[in-house]
Amino acid sequence: MNYTSYILAFQLCVILGSSGCYCQAPFFDEIENLKKYFNASNPDVADGGPLFLEILKNWKEESDKKIIQSQIVSFYFKLFENLKDNQIIQRSMDIIKQDMFQKFLNGSSEKLEDFKKLIQIPVDNLKVQRKAISELIKVMNDLSPKSNLRKRKRSQNLFRGRRASK
């Protein structure tokens, strides 16, 4: 009898430990509140296919997936910003935004502020467009993988060193 109790307790721990739903119940409740408010469980929502899920499936590498996720999170932050005056769903949006903030930006308020600044940059403003084009070379250089540059410099130095010793 005692042995059976230990096995059942162990199985319960494994099930609860592997289930993310157990510790995230309030988060899911808030999503359910938003689904009810927007009538998002209605079958017509599926018309035209999913908005983000198919795109997420296409990206397997973690670094690539982060790029897509940043665009999706940006969309949700814009959506919540547009609905900020709606008191009926404000609490739900705040809880979900906080959870996104923790998961995507690792709780860094500096990252959140920078992320919000980027979201709010108007692309139809001529001055903004001119600044963006002016900064494009530096942005492109920043996008280049730095590890390859280091490897290239290292191999060039090794090659030069061999040539100099002959």
From Swiss-Prot:
Q: Which Gene3D superfamilies match?
A: 1.20.1250.10
BP GO annotations: adaptive immune response; defense response to virus; humoral immune response
In the UniProt record, the signal sequence range is 1-23
Gene Ontology terms for molecular function: cytokine activity; type II interferon receptor binding
| Annotated TM spans | none
| Residues with Pyrrolidone carboxylic acid modification | Q24
Instruction: Kindly state the tissue distribution recorded for this protein.
Output: Released primarily from activated T lymphocytes.
Description of how the protein assembles with itself and partners: Homodimer. Interacts with IFNGR1 (via extracellular domain); this interaction promotes IFNGR1 dimerization.
Name of this protein: Interferon gamma
* Annotated organism of origin: Camelus bactrianus
